[in-house]
Amino acid sequence: MTMNITSKQMEITPAIRQHVADRLAKLEKWQTHLINPHIILSKEPQGFVADATINTPNGVLVASGKHEDMYTAINELINKLERQLNKLQHKGEARRAATSVKDANFVEEVEEE
């Protein structure tokens, strides 16, 4: 998977690049094609910020993670992306209702007659 990693006010080390790649590989368990992931890593006075924009066939995932430690900010970012992917994958199942309350009452009335 190809990914773009951009940094602002800091240098990307091979260790950071490898950590991002390893954590993004965790998202592959959802069996969704990740189209052109773009990760932005920046250093701010309060700590580090990791932002991501990832296109998928079902929509766009956008998340941000902030922490004093760069690796923890990346982990927060990936956890947020994983929750979004889970929600996106199960969206159709959540909207599918077995029967509504009206239909259930109607079935009971028919049986009583």
Curated annotation (Swiss-Prot):
Pfam families named among the record's database cross-references: Ribosomal_S30AE (PF02482)
InterPro entries from the UniProt entry: HPF/YfiA_ribosome-assoc, RHF-like, RHF/RaiA
CDD domains found in the cross-reference section: RaiA
Gene Ontology molecular function: any one: ribosomal small subunit binding
Triggers of expression: During stationary phase (at protein level). Also by cold stress, remains ribosome-associated for the 4 hours tested, then disappears when cells are warmed (at protein level).
Family indicated by similarity: Belongs to the HPF/YfiA ribosome-associated protein family. YfiA subfamily.
PANTHER family listed in its UniProt record: 30S RIBOSOMAL PROTEIN, RIBOSOME-ASSOCIATED INHIBITOR A
Protein name stated in the entry: Ribosome-associated inhibitor A
Organism: Escherichia coli (strain K12)
Taxonomic placement: Bacteria, Pseudomonadati, Pseudomonadota, Gammaproteobacteria, Enterobacterales
